[in-house]
Amino acid sequence: MYIAIISDLIGSRELADRNKAQQALHSTLEQCNENFKDELAARFTITVGDEFQALLKPEANPFHILDWIEFHLETLNFRSGIGIGEITTDIIEDRALGADGSAFWNAR
């Protein structure tokens, strides 16, 4: 069993400086990946625009990690889906792309 997180920024289309927001998201997720590397099965990855996702190991605490991201993004708000389930494909550890299974289905 794994824990999938799928998130996106709220109201990003209305941001005055989308590039600055994207840079803040990227640097926050890179720092998060380093800080929580032992809990991640696949690193946080920006997928499309302002969406990001990760795959956590079963013992990880997704709420702790999401709270950390929220604190470090400061003024940027986001929403997340959390899914617990199986992964039926190979897991690429350095990015949360290409994986499939009920963990991601449930997070949507």
Language-model segments: residues:
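Regulatory and interdomain segments flanking nucleotide-handling catalytic cores
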Residues: M1-R108
